[in-house]
Structure formats: C-alpha cells, structure tokens
A protein has these predicted regions:
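Active-site oxyanion/phosphate-handling segment shared across diverse enzymes
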Residues: 5-9, 40
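Interdomain hinge/lid region at the active-site interface
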Residues: 24-94
Length: 100
C-alpha cells in the first residue's frame, strides 16, 4: 500500500520534473504543475532506502504505471481520440470510486 500511496507519487514527481521543458515553463504553469511537483523536493538518501526496502511493491506499482502511461502514449501517437477519451473517462471513474 505504501508503494502506491507514498512512494509512487515521489517517483512520478521526481521523474516528471526532469523533463527539459521544466526549465522553460515559467509563466505557463499553475496548480496542476505545482500539485504534481511538490514532492520532488525530497531527502534522496531516505527515499532511496524506502524504495529499496519496499522493492517488490514499488516495482509492481512502477510496472503498472508504465503500462498505463504506454496506453495513453499509444492512443496519442496513433491519433486515436476514442481510445484516449476512454482512458481519460476510466481514470475519472476510478478517481470517483476511490475518493468519491
């Protein structure tokens, strides 16, 4: 559970902020950017230890997330609006079910 609720947000945030675009975003970012990147400010040695101590669960969550990202990427790359809408609606529905 910790891999999903705590460790993954830190990994995603940290990976996201490494985009070359991050250095040129000023004036274009708002709440979504701030929400996603807040936890990138972290204690690297502590988090590395936590990721490795929970290695199997963290890898499971990472693999699941990568698979999901690839589905979005494939839909965008193939200009498949219907699939993209389905993916987005599924995500919204999951959020409503989980956090209603």
């Amino acid at each position: 559970m910790i891999a999903f609720t705590s460790q993954m947000p830190h990994i995603v945030s940290n990976a996201y902020i490494k985009s070359p675009t991050a250095r040129t975003h000023r004036g274009f970012s708002a709440g979504s950017y701030k929400d996603l990147t807040r936890v990138a400010w972290l204690n690297a040695p502590m988090w590395a230890e936590l990721f490795l101590e929970n290695r199997d669960n963290t890898l499971y969550e990472l693999d699941t997330f990568i698979e999901s990202l690839n589905a979005y990427r494939d839909a965008i790359a193939s200009n498949d609006e219907a699939t993209l809408i389905t993916l987005l609606e599924e995500g919204k529905r999951c959020k409503e079910e989980v956090d209603g």
